[in-house]
């Protein structure tokens, strides 16, 4: 049995990952914000016979994070998955930027994954586990596109932060992987997306399972394709 900690687990890809892990009898600590719609996650936990435990966590709130860290202090974590994210403000072009919204997007999508990785690193080390962060091809530096710029910047930032984390944790034997879940039919991805959350989660689960220190620091799509930065 593995133990997984998944952020942003109340819907979409996060919820699909919770179902995938719990479905094979792995223990899942599933986090969601207090204000989020988490009825489906709570119902799933209630019928999971203890395989799923819901933890209240706003990933950008240090007080919430400290509380979650205390709750999980004695729990080895085999897989830490940074999934929580936001799409950014309504105005996010270079010439019409909601700067407060930009800061909030960076806080959730880029800074929080690193903060969470540091907070739960002792748990991951105790299990000889691994750290996974979901990102996006929209953060690729080779793209000149400027739509959804706050979101793009946040994903470029988290890619670099996770590569840095991978470099620093490699001597300690903790692998770090950046995953692109594909274009998924979620609230963020829209109804026209190609993949269901379950298809994306199943593909990523295979990659997570076989991740070792030799593959640390890579940026992979859900189907295993290596992506450019």
List the predicted regions and their residue ranges.
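Conserved mid-core alpha-helix of short-chain dehydrogenase/reductase
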Residues: 64-67, 112-119
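Catalytic loop of short-chain dehydrogenase/reductase
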Residues: 86-106, 111-115, 125-170
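N-terminal Rossmann NAD(P)H-binding glycine-rich loop of SDR-like oxidoreductase domains
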Residues: 10, 14-19
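Conserved glycine-rich Rossmann-like NAD(P)H-binding loop of the short-chain dehydrogenase/reductase
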Residues: 22-40
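The beta1-alpha1 cofactor-binding region of Rossmann-like NAD(H)/NADP(H)-dependent oxidoreductases
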Residues: 55-67
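Rossmann-fold scaffold of SDR-type NAD(P)-dependent oxidoreductases
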Residues: 7, 77-85, 109, 133, ...
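Conserved SDR Rossmann-fold cofactor-binding beta-strand/turn motif
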Residues: 32, 175-181, 185
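C-terminal helical subdomain
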Residues: 171, 178-181, 190-229
């Amino acid at each position: 049995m593995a133990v997984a900690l998944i952020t942003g687990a109340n819907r979409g890809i996060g919820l699909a990952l919770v179902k995938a892990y719990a479905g094979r009898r792995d223990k899942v600590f599933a986090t969601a914000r207090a204000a989020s719609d988490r009825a489906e996650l709570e119902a799933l936990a209630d019928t999971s016979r203890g395989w799923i435990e819901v933890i209240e966590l706003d990933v950008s709130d240090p007080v919430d994070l400290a509380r979650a860290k205390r709750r999980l202090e004695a729990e080895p974590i085999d897989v830490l998955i940074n999934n929580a994210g936001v799409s950014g403000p309504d105005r996010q072009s270079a010439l019409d930027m909601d700067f407060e919204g930009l800061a909030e997007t960076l806080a959730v999508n880029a800074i929080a994954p690193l903060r969470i990785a540091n907070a739960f690193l002792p748990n991951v080390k105790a299990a000889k586990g691994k750290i996974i962060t979901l990102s996006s091809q929209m953060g690729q530096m080779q793209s000149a596109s400027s739509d959804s710029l706050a979101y793009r910047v946040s994903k470029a930032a988290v890619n670099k932060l996770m590569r840095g984390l991978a470099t620093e944790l490699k001597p300690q034997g903790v692998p770090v992987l950046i995953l692109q879940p594909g274009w998924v039919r979620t609230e963020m991805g829209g109804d026209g997306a190609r993949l269901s959350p379950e298809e994306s989660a199943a593909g990523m689960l295979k990659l997570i399972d076989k991740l070792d220190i030799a593959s640390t620091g890579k940026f992979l799509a859900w189907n295993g394709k290596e992506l450019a930065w």
